[in-house]
């Protein structure tokens, strides 16, 4: 979360941000603290309700959350729906890690069509260790395992995304590996030029 937030403006007053796959709402709250108007969306109504409840409590105890006039609207639903309108920035933290290369590229393309400045996302980078773990995970019955990570080769993903969005003025920006304990992801920024 800290890496993706570091790629966003410190002052987000007057900017609209989509937190696509908001989970518990931690990133949405930090964007609000910077003054952003945030739409925090997740497929899980349970997570959205948890995020909404935590946010209500945090507003009571942390006056810095609303000091710059930001706001958060929490919603359970499809992050790719055009009904949500346009945004200045979009963040998809760990919401695309279960998808294959083409599906990620399609999602990024759909989001860039409604975004003015940047789309930030994470994906599960291909590595020999993850490839072995992924193969071993397929040995277990589907009902006994958690959602499957899709290890992605960043060079292939780059080709797919660039092919989809380059003609609309989008270019790759920052890229950083994020590791903490067993967690590893690749964070990537695409910017409109």
Tell what function each PLM region has.
Residues 1-13:
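Conserved alpha-helix/loop element of class I SAM-dependent methyltransferases that forms part
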Residues 18, 26-65, 69-78:
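Class I SAM-dependent methyltransferase SAM/SAH-binding core
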Residues 23:
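Conserved glycine-rich SAM-binding loop
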Residues 81-85:
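Short conserved loop adjoining the S-adenosyl-L-methionine
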Residues 91:
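A conserved beta-strand element that flanks and buttresses the S-adenosyl-L-methionine
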Residues 99-110:
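A short, conserved alpha-helix within the catalytic core of class I
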Residues 116-124:
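Conserved beta-strand signature within the Rossmann-like core of class I S-adenosyl-L-methionine
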Residues 148-166:
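Short alpha-helix
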């Amino acid at each position: 979360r800290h890496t993706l937030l570091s790629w966003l403006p410190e002052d987000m007053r007057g900017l609209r941000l989509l937190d696509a796959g908001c989970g518990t709402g931690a990133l949405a709250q930090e964007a609000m603290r910077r003054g952003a108007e945030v739409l925090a969306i997740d497929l899980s109504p349970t997570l959205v309700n948890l995020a909404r409840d935590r946010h209500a409590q945090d507003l009571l105890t942390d006056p810095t959350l609303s000091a710059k006039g930001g706001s958060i609207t929490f919603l359970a639903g499809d992050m790719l729906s055009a009904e949500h309108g346009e945004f200045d920035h979009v963040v998809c933290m760990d919401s695309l890690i279960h998808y294959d290369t083409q599906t990620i590229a399609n999602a990024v393309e759909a989001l860039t069509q409604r975004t003015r400045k940047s789309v930030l996302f994470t994906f599960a980078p291909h590595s020999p260790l993850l490839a072995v773990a992924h193969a071993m995970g397929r040995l277990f019955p589907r009902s006994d395992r958690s959602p499957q990570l899709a290890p992605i080769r960043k060079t292939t993903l780059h080709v797919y995304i660039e092919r989809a969005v380059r003609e609309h003025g989008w270019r790759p920006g920052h890229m950083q590996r994020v590791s903490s304990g067993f967690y590893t992801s690749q964070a990537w920024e695409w910017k409109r030029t």
